[in-house]
Amino acid sequence: MDDIAPGMDWKKFADFKALLDEYGIKPLIGVVPDNQDRNLERTEENGKDGREHMPEDFWEYVKGLQERGWIIAMHGYRHVYTQKKGGVFPLNLFSEFAGLPLAEQLAMLEKGRSVLDSHGIKTDIFMAPAHSYDRNTLKALRQAGFGRITDGFGSKPYLWKQMCFYPISFRLGSSLKKNHGITTMVVHVNTVNRKDMENYRRIFREYETISYGDYLQTEAVKRGWAGHGVEYLLAVGKRILVKFL
């Protein structure tokens, strides 16, 4: 689940959480440490319906989810796109991190981690806003104590640049039809609609599911430059297809 922030659409979050609870699924959630992205501020625009589901203390609520087995990733720092770069996984040509100097990226990561630490939330997993990061991001992540990142394409975790990647699905429909491997899907909780909910319910009902904590126990395989080259081209291709569809 993406874009978890204090002002998100709490009604939609509550509805999706209820669906996850029904099927016993404990997901990974990407938490923005210091959200400055107005697009993620949805509580007020949803009025009373949104505020009724909003917890009194956001950070205590997130910490409680972690204690109950939900996996927390740090989703960027402020979720503000200042760079027109796609980095080494160019699904998008905008970024909070890719294109910035190493020292600046490291400072952002350390500030984000400090926010999480101050609320008792520990994680070494990073989720890049817009899926965009570059080699400096990976260096900065290692220096800041992050060893895992939720991105890339594949059917199992892989090792590259001294980081462990937990890939997303290139094309969910095709991934679900495969009889091997594990696929993950990205849920933008602020934009989930009724049709989406029906589709997620169908997926949970028809396919075998596991919690993200179980996925983290999957043995990672090594990936070299050739594998990364294919992944890069797939990301470019998907970006172009999405643009024209």
State each model region's role.
Residues 1-68, 115:
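Active-site beta->alpha N-cap acidic-glycine motif
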Residues 13-14, 53-62, 154-175:
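Alpha-helical scaffolding within the catalytic cores
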Residues 13-17, 59-63, 109-113, 138, ...:
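Generic structural signal for well-ordered alpha-helices
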Residues 24-31, 149, 191-245:
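C-terminal domain-boundary segment and adjacent tail
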Residues 27-29, 72-75, 123-126, 148-151, ...:
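Hydrophobic faces of well-ordered beta-strands that scaffold small-molecule active sites
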Residues 33, 76-82:
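Short glycine-enriched loops at secondary-structure junctions
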Residues 80-92:
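Short, flexible, mixed-charge acidic loops at enzyme active sites
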Residues 96-171, 193-197:
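Catalytic domains of cell-wall/extracellular-matrix polysaccharide-remodeling enzymes
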